[in-house]
Amino acid sequence: MELLSIIFFFLSTYGLGAAISFFVAESEEFLERNLMRFGIGLGLMLFLGFLLNLLKIPLDWRIFMILSLLVLISKFYLDYRKNRLFSLDLKLNMYAVLVIVLFAATSYMHVKGAFAYPYLEDDDSWSHSLGIKYVAVEKTAFAGPNSPFGYLDPYPPAYDMLFGIIHQTNNSLYWTMKFFNALIVSIPLIFFYFFAKIFTK
């Protein structure tokens, strides 16, 4: 089940991030183009979650997966029609490769540390766990007035919403919070590198 959660996270963020290519030109560098799709997709996943919530559509992980796959299939078809499906010119940036290595080391450190003890970190984690389980079961981030959830509506519920959607793909709230919190803390290193690269040209 944990493997399904990891596949869902990366496939859905990448698929949603690929949608940006329909509207703006992407980088010519292979790594930058593909890695930034994860970052953009993560932001779009949160935006889409809020939109679905406002429209009273359940926050079901299968909806996000289907939309992501539709984007990827559409992109594949359009690239095939334009004969630009595969490119042998990868243009690997060695600095980007180094950042990926740093990300891998940082992720390992955070994941290893998170699972070194069998408890959640502090009071915030326990409060978030209530909201995450609520989103996973009820498939909504709106709990209504006087709810016992400290990090759902009216508080911006992005964290609990994202983790609640992911938690639908496995049966361990503990693992979901430990693993994906470590991943979410580590992955911005990649996005910050490309952000800094643009602003230091």
Task: Name what the model sees in each region.
Residues M1-L92:
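Membrane-embedded, hydrophobic transmembrane alpha-helices
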Residues F8, F30-E32, F47, V101, ...:
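Hydrophobic alpha-helical context, especially transmembrane and signal-peptide helices
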Residues L11, L35, S74-Y77, I100, ...:
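Generic intrinsically disordered, low-complexity segments enriched for polar/acidic and small residues
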Residues A18-A25, V99-T106, I132:
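Membrane-targeting and insertion segments and their boundary/processing signals
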Residues F22, F47-F50, L98-L102, W126, ...:
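Generic detector of bulky aromatic hydrophobic side chains
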Residues I40-L44, L67-L70, L102-A105, S125-L130:
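Mid-membrane cores of alpha-helical transmembrane segments in multi-pass membrane proteins
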Residues D89-H110:
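Internal/C-terminal transmembrane anchor helices
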Residues A104-K201:
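Active-site lumenal/periplasmic loops and adjacent helix-entry segments of GT-C-fold
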